[in-house]
Amino acid sequence: MAEKFIKHTGLVVPLDAANVDTDAIIPKQFLQKVTRTGFGAHLFNDWRFLDEKGQQPNPDFVLNFPQYQGASILLARENFGCGSSREHAPWALTDYGFKVVIAPSFADIFYGNSFNNQLLPVKLSDAEVDELFALVKANPGIHFDVDLEAQEVKAGEKTYRFTIDAFRRHCMMNGLDSIGLTLQHDDAIASYEEKQPAFMR
């Protein structure tokens, strides 16, 4: 069972870029592994580092700024997670420590993969995201409160409403991935299997 997501308060880092694709999130040369851990070290590798091996941090990239170390909420622009459908993208984000991504829109496959990996993608309007970028710029180190149960983001003096469909919300709040959903019906599955003829088992 995955970790439950009900509420999260975290430091916000502003990635002021639209159309951030999955190859930028986790470059293809790091996709050999099939476990979900270890990808955070290579998150935004080509932007975070000046060398291919990831040894020399790029001082001009926002994730490397001292005031954003330990950030767990990523603020981005429209069409976040576009490109190929690699599930490694949310793996890299969560392994780095992100719990929430806020943007005006997400690529459909990335959006679905995020829920499967307990990464909450929050859609707000362009105008609301503009407000949040301005707020973070004026208040480096600001924390947002994200409440999945109430479907609200509290930022400064304002509260922003977002909508997550009921099924995905239920899964995240109960820490259920695809396997967890199946295991909810473990007794019913076992009962069904016991009723099958021996040659079908």
Curated annotation (Swiss-Prot):
It is an enzyme of class 4 (lyase). One of its GO terms (molecular function) is 3-isopropylmalate dehydratase activity. InterPro entries: 3-IsopropMal_deHydase_ssu, Aconitase/3IPM_dehydase_swvl, AconitaseA/IPMdHydase_ssu_swvl, IPMI_Swivel, LeuD. It catalyses: (2R,3S)-3-isopropylmalate = (2S)-2-isopropylmalate. Pathway: Amino-acid biosynthesis; L-leucine biosynthesis; L-leucine from 3-methyl-2-oxobutanoate: step 2/4. Its EC number is 4.2.1.33. GO terms for biological process: L-leucine biosynthetic process. Gene3D superfamilies: Aconitase, domain 4 (3.20.19.10). GO terms for cellular component: 3-isopropylmalate dehydratase complex. Keywords: Amino-acid biosynthesis, Branched-chain amino acid biosynthesis, Leucine biosynthesis, Lyase. Transmembrane segments: none annotated. Signal peptide: none annotated. The keyword Amino-acid biosynthesis applies. Catalyzes the isomerization between 2-isopropylmalate and 3-isopropylmalate, via the formation of 2-isopropylmaleate. Belongs to the LeuD family. LeuD type 1 subfamily. Heterodimer of LeuC and LeuD. This is 3-isopropylmalate dehydratase small subunit.
